């Protein structure tokens, strides 16, 4: 078990069905053109502001637009786009959507101990690229909404993946069950840890489906009838050795892996496409899942990361993050807190309890 809880507030991210707004050189040439762009942006994303607030937010918006514009003119491997967060400062974004208090948990619980077991330690031959989406082991991108449940989404991606690998059946599982019922140490919309969620699933005998226990984006009372109708079980979990992208690669070559990252930077805030190489630290504040890796034509290595902010953010809900950097923690700390579920067979819980629940519904 990890020595501290990741994601106290997680990323309370909400994305509308609208996509990012395109703009051009003429839109940033003058104060008037920027104001017109701001009004278009507000209409595009249905953002209501008072007259007083508009004046304040317009200055923030100008700063962000210019940052996006200047960044996209540079020879970078990724692009930014003006999205829902166009008039939020970088600090507001970090405070609201990346507000995890990880240092407190580190000091309180101490550094985690060395990994006891890593089943892929002796794997020496790896494919040059892996994409579990192409292998049918990844469900469509989901949206956590205004709830700090990224830890639950990260957990579910990994469990859905290993279940499909073992059974050849892809089942969308319930994040809401984790939010409502895994509350002994995890804290629902106020954050949690993937390792604890894996152990909860193991101890409860499995996790039910999203169809049976749909997502509400809020803390609700645990529905024990639904909780007692598991459809997918696991046998525990293991941690990837800390600060080793090589070991993370070994794990991802065999199954999707839950990871924590620092997602609070402005470039992450406005990421749209390409291999992300932007500035970020190791203040882990968001749970995501690595579902593959690869290399671009020009030789840039990357991780394929599934997010939980809907398909409108990034590359249809995904971000490619640079892999193999010189810092041992990996870009944005991606190699610091990786773990994956264990499933030793192709069997799952009996459908009797699920069928009984469906009869009641």
Swiss-Prot record:
Inhibited by leupeptin and the cysteine protease inhibitor E64 (L-trans-epoxysuccinyl-leucylamide-(4-guanido)-butane). Residues 21-125 form a propeptide. A motif (Prevents secretion from ER) lies at residues 358-361. GO terms for biological process: anther wall tapetum development; defense response to fungus; plant-type hypersensitive response; pollen development; programmed cell death involved in cell development; proteolysis. Gene3D superfamilies: Cysteine proteinases (3.90.70.10). It comes from the Eukaryota. Disruption phenotype: Reduced male fertility due to impaired pollen development and abnormal pollen exine. Enhanced susceptibility to powdery mildew caused by the biotrophic ascomycete Erysiphe cruciferarum. Pfam families: Inhibitor_I29, Peptidase_C1. It is an enzyme of class 3 (hydrolase). Keywords: Disulfide bond, Endoplasmic reticulum, Hydrolase, Plant defense, Protease, Signal, Thiol protease, Vacuole, Zymogen. Residues 1-20 form the signal peptide. The active site is at 150, 286, 307. GO terms for molecular function: cysteine-type endopeptidase activity. One of its GO terms (cellular component) is endoplasmic reticulum. InterPro entries: Papain-like_cys_pep_sf, Pept_asp_AS, Pept_cys_AS, Pept_his_AS, Peptidase_C1A, Peptidase_C1A_C, Peptidase_C1A_papain-like, Prot_inhib_I29. It is found in: Endoplasmic reticulum; Vacuole. PANTHER family: CYSTEINE PROTEASE FAMILY C1-RELATED. Belongs to the peptidase C1 family. This is KDEL-tailed cysteine endopeptidase CEP1. It comes from Arabidopsis thaliana. The gene is CEP1.
């Amino acid at each position: 078990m990890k020595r501290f809880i990741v994601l106290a507030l997680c990323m309370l991210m909400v994305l509308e069905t609208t996509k990012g707004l395109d703009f051009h050189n003429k839109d940033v040439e003058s104060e008037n053109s920027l104001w017109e762009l701001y009004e278009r942006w507000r209409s595009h994303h249905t953002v209501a502001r008072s007259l007083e607030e508009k004046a304040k937010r317009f200055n923030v918006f100008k700063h962000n637009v210019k940052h996006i514009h200047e960044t996209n003119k540079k020879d970078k491997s990724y692009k930014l786009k003006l999205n829902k967060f166009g008039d939020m400062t970088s600090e507001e974004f970090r405070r609201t959507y990346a507000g995890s208090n990880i240092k407190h948990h580190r000091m309180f619980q101490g550094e985690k101990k060395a990994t006891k077991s890593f089943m892929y330690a002796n794997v020496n031959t790896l494919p040059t690229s892996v994409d579990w989406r192409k292998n049918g082991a990844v469900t469509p991108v989901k949206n956590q909404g205004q709830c700090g449940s990224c830890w639950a989404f990260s957990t579910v991606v990994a469990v859905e993946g290993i279940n499909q690998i073992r059974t050849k059946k892809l089942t969308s599982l319930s994040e809401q069950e984790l939010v409502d019922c895994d509350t002994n140490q995890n804290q629902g919309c106020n954050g949690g840890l993937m390792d604890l969620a894996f152990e909860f699933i193991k101890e409860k005998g499995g996790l039910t489906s999203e169809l049976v226990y749909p997502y509400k984006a809020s803390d609700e009372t645990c529905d024990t009838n639904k909780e007692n109708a598991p459809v997918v079980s696991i046998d525990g979990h293991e941690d990837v050795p800390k600060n080793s992208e090589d070991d993370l690669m070994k794990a991802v070559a065999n199954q999707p892996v839950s990871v924590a990252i620092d997602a609070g930077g402005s470039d992450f805030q406005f990421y749209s496409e390409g291999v992300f190489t932007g500035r970020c630290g190791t203040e882990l504040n968001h749970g995501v899942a690595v579902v593959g890796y690869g290399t671009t034509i020009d030789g840039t290595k990357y991780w394929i990361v599934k997010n939980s902010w809907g398909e409108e953010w990034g590359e249809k809900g995904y971000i490619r993050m640079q892999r193999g950097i010189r810092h041992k923690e990996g870009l944005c700390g991606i190699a610091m807190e990786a773990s994956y579920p264990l499933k030793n067979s192709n069997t799952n819980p009996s459908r009797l309890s699920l069928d009984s629940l469906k009869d009641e519904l």
